[in-house]
């Protein structure tokens, strides 16, 4: 299962469980901008709206969480739980400040950091063309030349989010698509 399908399944499952408890569930989908917003509702029939938005979601553009958090905050009223699911592959300079804003608004924030297992282990060999799910052009290279640097960068990114989330009291869950 690729990471987009993994994230869809995760969000659908969490939405289903929360709606079964009659909790209000909303959905905001974003890349560099807010692409779609389904306002929170607690009716079980609301699940079909969540599933529809997840089904039509197509990855595009660069993900910029720090630019979207303000838009999300403006749509949220009162306290609640905000769950962010992303691959967090871009290191954003002000993301810690934006996450702090969410916490200061009385929101309980949970982050699910989802990566494909191959993105973590980087098991590739020989000349390979890598294609982005977003808007980056394909690139051809020999993975052996960059494996160590790449794996260190991925681990640094995971550590960065784990550390900053812990400082802010945010639950951070790292998931690989193989789990």
Regions found by a protein language model. Name each.
Residues 1-179:
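Exposed, interaction-prone extracellular/peripheral surfaces
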